């Protein structure tokens, strides 16, 4: 066919005249011919060559990114990722494309079930987006907000893994410190002004306070107590736990109140479900109303 003939002719020309001033023009034509002839991988290879040899920075950056896109579209993600990483290093000022390149790595490692590499790229995305905050877009903000929120999962795991053992004062102080750390990170997500992420952060903050209250109530008891002393100890634990449970409910209410402002998402729905357990007399009734909220807003 004509595209096969064009590819052959252009390839011969480049082999014979590698220094010719039309060499780069022939490369562009080859990319087009490969795509028209359904040879996307050959097109990608030629684009990589262009990205490494042409002086025009705009052309090299576009060629490199386009090559990565072609590899991705044809499920050669293992070849696309190094190109996207190179793009980020070589063209940090290409903000929109660099954001997408970061996100492509996150998606790739999520698919590969490689949690540590995914987390590494989430950290890179958050850091890169933050350092270029003047260029922030709705898209970059949304991606960074989601990455930053997911990065708090490891802090949540650390918090939940702290067992309240005797002496209670020491282990409780450790758990409270972990709580402050995660709450600080979740509150920091407000910079993204993302309604869903703020619902998620509010839900998680309330949940860690609720978890702390529960963990205090089921914490280890001293073995040497009499029945009366044990009852008194239980009362002391309830007094310790109560403020945290109250704080959790107050924070959950922030999500509940968002419904009246026209907001409803899965985190608000989960908030209603939790409140129905914590305060059933008031929220069992409200829970029946919430399925209609999505149609209202």
Give the ranges of each region predicted by the language model.
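Acidic, polar-rich low-complexity tracts and alpha-helical solenoid repeat scaffolds
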Residues: 1-297
């Amino acid at each position: 066919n004509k595209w096969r003939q064009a590819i052959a002719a252009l390839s011969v020309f480049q082999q014979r005249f590698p220094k010719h001033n039309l060499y780069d023009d022939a490369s562009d034509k080859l990319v087009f011919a490969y795509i028209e002839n359904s040879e996307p991988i050959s097109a990608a290879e030629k684009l990589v060559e262009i990205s490494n040899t042409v002086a025009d920075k705009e052309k090299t950056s576009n060629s490199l990114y386009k090559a990565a896109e072609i590899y991705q579209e044809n499920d050669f993600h293992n070849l696309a990722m190094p190109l996207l990483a190179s793009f980020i290093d070589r063209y940090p000022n290409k903000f929109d494309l660099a954001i997408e390149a970061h996100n492509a790595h996150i998606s790739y490692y999520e698919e590969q079930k490689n949690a540590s590499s995914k987390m590494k790229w989430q950290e890179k995305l958050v850091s890169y987006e933050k350092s270029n905050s003047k260029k922030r877009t709705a898209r970059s903000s949304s991606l960074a907000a989601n990455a930053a929120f997911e990065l708090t999962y490891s802090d949540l795991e650390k918090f939940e893994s702290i067992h309240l053992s005797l002496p209670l004062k020491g282990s409780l102080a450790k758990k409270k410190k972990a709580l402050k750390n995660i709450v600080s990170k979740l509150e920091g997500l407000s910079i993204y002004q993302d309604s869903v992420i703020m619902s998620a952060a509010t839900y998680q903050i309330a949940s860690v306070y609720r978890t702390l209250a529960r963990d205090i109530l089921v914490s280890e008891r001293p073995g040497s107590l009499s029945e009366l002393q044990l009852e008194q100890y239980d009362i002391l634990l309830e007094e310790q736990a109560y403020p945290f449970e109250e704080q959790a409910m107050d924070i959950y209410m922030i999500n509940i109140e968002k419904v009246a402002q026209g907001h409803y998402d899965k985190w608000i729905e989960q908030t209603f479900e939790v409140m129905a357990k914590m305060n059933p007399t008031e929220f069992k009734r409200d829970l029946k109303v919430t399925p209609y909220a999505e149609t209202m807003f």
